[in-house]
């Protein structure tokens, strides 16, 4: 029996971020899965009245199914802490650090994890960034520091592409990060309660795994387990666990890597609230271990707690 059997569960989804549509899918899928396990579930689309609605609905525990700003960055976690409502996923500080790529990259380096060379530029100077500002040259990857789901991310191969890419990244959240492009195999690792569940290989139809590749059906192939030498899989899973611990995460995370030809796992980011539809990557990995989607959601719910 679940820790929260008989309790009123709110699945928090939607919200105001650029990843709202993804969150709506995640929340609906998780709510359905928890109902299949017998839980009393109310779906709450997070808005400026969410605190009043949590009280009105007599919520006893929150399943956080938000993505992006205001949901994955510690904001909703802080509200839940102040209301003494236990919640799933990482706490305020871990969520904030995981969302800010500038902070998380510095932490990864301090842990001894492989991080591609990068530079951080203030949003105000994005329009003046040139190839001469990049000691690693081209190709490079441009991304906003405070977004997820590859929103505002660009692969830049030519000098003429750099300015527009930087200006677009600056239109999103956070500073602009420009990092050396690492050629290799894209691999994501699911971590649950500090233990790596497995590694899945991602093969997009084009050279770059961008927003369209993630969310347009049929544009990307996935291979689980990842088609890598066993030693490389072990290395990437160990790195994922180290990143999860280093950020101070709780519950489930998805840690993204590029595994170079020599087996070096270059870490990209930790997703403290990964996509959780029945066809998302974390559920795919869990299914490979015999853990159904409803069982996975209940495992995550069982870890709900106050973290402050």
Curated annotation (Swiss-Prot):
Keywords: ATP-binding, Cell shape, Cell wall biogenesis/degradation, Cytoplasm, Ligase, Magnesium, Manganese, Metal-binding, Nucleotide-binding, Peptidoglycan synthesis. Its cofactor is Mg(2+); Mn(2+). GO terms for cellular component: cytoplasm. Mg(2+) 2 binds at residues 269, 271. Its main location: cytoplasm. Mg(2+) 1 binds at residues 256, 269. It is found in: Cytoplasm. GO terms for biological process: cell wall organization; peptidoglycan biosynthetic process; regulation of cell shape. The keyword Secreted does not apply. Pathway: Cell wall biogenesis; peptidoglycan biosynthesis. ATP binds at residues 133-188. Transmembrane segments: none annotated. Residues 105-302 form the ATP-grasp domain. One of its GO terms (molecular function) is metal ion binding. PROSITE patterns: ATP_GRASP, DALA_DALA_LIGASE_1, DALA_DALA_LIGASE_2. It is an enzyme of class 6 (ligase). Cell wall formation. PANTHER family: D-ALANINE--D-ALANINE LIGASE, D-ALANINE--D-ALANINE LIGASE B. This is D-alanine--D-alanine ligase.
